[in-house]
Design a protein with these regions (language model features):
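Short hydrophobic/aromatic helix or loop-helix immediately within or flanking a transmembrane segment
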Residues: 49-83
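Membrane-water interface at transmembrane helix exits
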Residues: 10-14, 70, 74, 105-113, ...
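Short acidic/glycine- and proline-prone juxtamembrane loop motifs at membrane-interface regions
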Residues: 136-143
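Short hydrophobic alpha-helices at membrane interfaces in multi-pass membrane enzymes
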Residues: 160-169
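Specific aromatic-rich, kink-prone transmembrane helix
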Residues: 144-161
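Transmembrane-helix signature of polytopic, membrane-embedded enzymes
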Residues: 104-128
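Transmembrane signal-anchor helices characteristic of membrane glycosylation enzymes that use polyprenol
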Residues: 1-50
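Loop-to-helix entry region of an early transmembrane alpha helix in multi-pass inner-membrane enzymes
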Residues: 76-99
Length: 169
């Protein structure tokens, strides 16, 4: 619920500007109005106009999430003249934040075998840190990476606990 609220507040801060169906010029729209120190809006720009401003060698999987959203958003902009990039990115961020919390809790509870209270407190502590909480609302790749890292810790931890080797799947 908190992740939904934060993303809603971010979108509402410049709603009419962020959802303009501009034909090009998304760099100016987003960089002029999105100000979050240390975080960029390149995901919105990529979904809006397929201009890639991040290093794809370091984030190859991330582009595979964004490209289908670009195609859908491009069609929607042509059809209704409205940019849905901020909503598409918010769905990815909320989904990733929720599962990052879930996998982190499960690592504490099932892999490390902590009590429910301790696992809950440590999960809440982790997500109370600013550089963990802020990525759950900004259009950046950090929370997606946290979800995959916590998922990897959970899967590898459960395999280690059972004494099994990791397989291709």
């Amino acid at each position: 619920l908190m992740f939904i609220l934060f993303n809603g507040l971010l979108i509402a801060s410049h709603y009419h500007t962020y959802t303009m169906g501009a034909h090009g010029g998304f760099w100016s729209i987003f960089t002029k109005h999105f100000r979050m120190s240390g975080y960029d809006n390149w995901s919105w720009i990529t979904i809006s106009g397929m201009r890639i401003h991040f290093v794809t060698n370091r984030h190859p999987l991330y582009l595979t999430f964004l490209y289908p959203l670009y195609l859908l958003n491009h069609w929607l902009i042509e059809t209704v003249g409205y940019n849905f990039a901020v909503y598409f990115m918010a769905v990815i961020i909320i989904f990733s934040a929720f599962y990052a919390v879930l996998f982190t809790y499960r690592v504490f509870r099932e892999v490390m075998e902590m009590k429910q209270k301790d696992a809950t407190l440590l999960t809440l502590l982790l997500f109370s840190f600013g550089h963990v909480l802020i990525p759950s609302m900004v259009p950046d790749h950090f929370i997606v990476s946290l979800m995959f890292l916590s998922m990897t810790l959970y899967i590898a931890g459960m395999k280690m606990k059972k004494g099994r080797l990791l397989t291709a799947w």
